[in-house]
């Protein structure tokens, strides 16, 4: 989001905190530590240099929770009214960057919690249609064929997912052309994720719940994951 829009969302969240009726109806943004997106060499990632229609991965707000970073190659929709599985509404405020084409979402599927690992990924952004995918330019989870529209807040287009992917809030600085992750919006699946994969994550190092601080390393999915399942 642009900086002034980020301030507006924070103000709206604060206002909702003082109005119980609004809290019951709307899902407020969840703010986490600020983490600047950086390339593999540690240099700040430049939004204008982010390749279009490629899957990029970073981890936020925890060390083990993966997210998609996507340049859609076209402006995302300016806003979308969405709701969580428990019927809390929220408004997604569109893409960021020079063309407002950059979006970010949790890469944990809202149905069965499939996510990209270093070995395999059943979920990714697909520009093409297929026999099982009637939509182009969607995030498609091949585990149960949930499909999400990244240009409209990850709205569910098909499949059993009960809600959109949680959006990752990005603060874009046009002066430096840099991106900073600041929080989430929508239905988080982090608690369910940690409960389901507790043993696996423990075997991978035991720091899965460590909050991400200062920076997030961004890597292309094909360089992060050995096998991408296509469907």
Please describe what each predicted stretch is.
Residues 1-14:
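N-terminal secretory signal peptides and thylakoid transit peptides that target proteins
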Residues 23-127, 171-231:
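N-terminal pre-ligand scaffold of iron-sulfur
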Residues 99-106, 130-142:
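Short beta-strand-alpha-helix junction that forms the catalytic/metal-binding core
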Residues 114, 141-152:
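Short Cys/His-centered divalent metal-binding micro-motifs
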Residues 121-122, 128-137, 149-182:
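Polybasic, low-complexity binding patches
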């Amino acid at each position: 989001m642009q900086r002034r829009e980020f301030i507006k969302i924070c103000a709206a969240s604060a206002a909702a905190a003082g109005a119980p009726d609004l809290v019951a109806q709307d899902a407020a943004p969840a703010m986490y530590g600020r983490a600047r997106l950086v390339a593999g060499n540690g240099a700040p990632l430049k939004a204008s240099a982010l390749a279009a229609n490629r899957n990029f991965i970073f981890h936020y707000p925890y060390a083990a929770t993966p997210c998609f970073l996507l340049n859609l190659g076209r402006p995302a929709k300016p806003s979308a009214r969405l709701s969580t599985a428990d019927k809390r509404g929220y408004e997604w405020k569109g893409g960021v960057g020079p063309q407002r084409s950059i979006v970010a979402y949790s890469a944990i599927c809202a149905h069965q919690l499939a996510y990209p690992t270093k070995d395999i990924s059943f979920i990714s952004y697909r520009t093409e249609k297929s026999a099982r995918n009637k939509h182009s330019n969607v995030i498609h989870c091949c585990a149960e064929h949930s499909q999400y529209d990244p240009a409209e807040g990850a709205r569910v287009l098909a499949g059993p997912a009960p809600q959109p992917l949680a959006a990752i809030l990005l603060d874009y600085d046009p002066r430096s052309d840099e991106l900073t992750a600041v929080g989430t919006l929508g239905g988080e699946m982090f608690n369910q994720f940690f409960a389901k994969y507790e043993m696996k994550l423990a075997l991978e190092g035991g720091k899965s719940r460590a909050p991400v601080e200062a920076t997030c390393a961004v890597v292309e999915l094909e360089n992060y994951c050995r096998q991408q399942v296509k469907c």
